[in-house]
Amino acid sequence: MDKIVLICATGRSGSTTLQRIINIIPNSNICGENFGAVNSLLEFYRRIKTTTFEYVPGHLRPASYEDIISKNVKPSWYNSYNFQQTVSMIKMLIASLFKNSETTNVWGFKEIRYDNGNINYIKEFKELFPETKVIIQVRANIQAQSQSNWFKKDKNALQYLNTLNNEFYNFYNQNKEWCYFTTFEKMFDKANVKKIFEFIECQEHYDENKIKQILDNNIKD
């Protein structure tokens, strides 16, 4: 079975470096950001699920248009899609974005667009792919983070990051069995990185030398 790994992070928290570290695993393909596109697919899944189970006459076996009309029911929620088939297509689309070959057996992506409660989309991802493991990465020193790149243009950056870190930590606390919480600062802690590899069940591929090379080579934007 494939191993699916998501890196859910705040901006300027070292998520790209963590992505590079995970990608030392043979046959892995942890992609970069997708501008929250996967969130949109998960929103679609969330909405089609609500439509199916709360509104569509017949739910998983939608009533025909003729049957609805014959019972003098307003067809405002009439639908003809197959829910299970629709879910399968969503899963196939998501997998096709990141599983780039038949031999790829560790795949996923990293994303930073999880503010305003969007971290909760990961629950839908977990429903679709129960084998998913999530690494949540923030930066402990939000003072320095708030002065990095685009954040330094936002006078409310410090408050924003503090709120976001709390949201991420609360999400982790609610889902500890499949989430690992870490920080930018802990990427330089060998024991912590080793635990991450153990968490995603790839401990045999932990390579201290390769990881050091990545940490020593900070690719600039």
PLM-predicted stretches and their roles:
Residues 98-206:
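PAPS-dependent sulfotransferase catalytic domain
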Residues 85-95, 165-170:
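Catalytic alpha-helical scaffold of carbohydrate-active enzymes acting on polysaccharides/glycoconjugates
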Residues 1, 94, 108, 170-173, ...:
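Polar low-complexity intrinsically disordered regions
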Residues 1-89, 206, 210-221:
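PAPS-dependent sulfotransferase catalytic core
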Residues 6, 10, 16-18, 96, ...:
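Short, flexible coil/linker segments at or flanking structured domains
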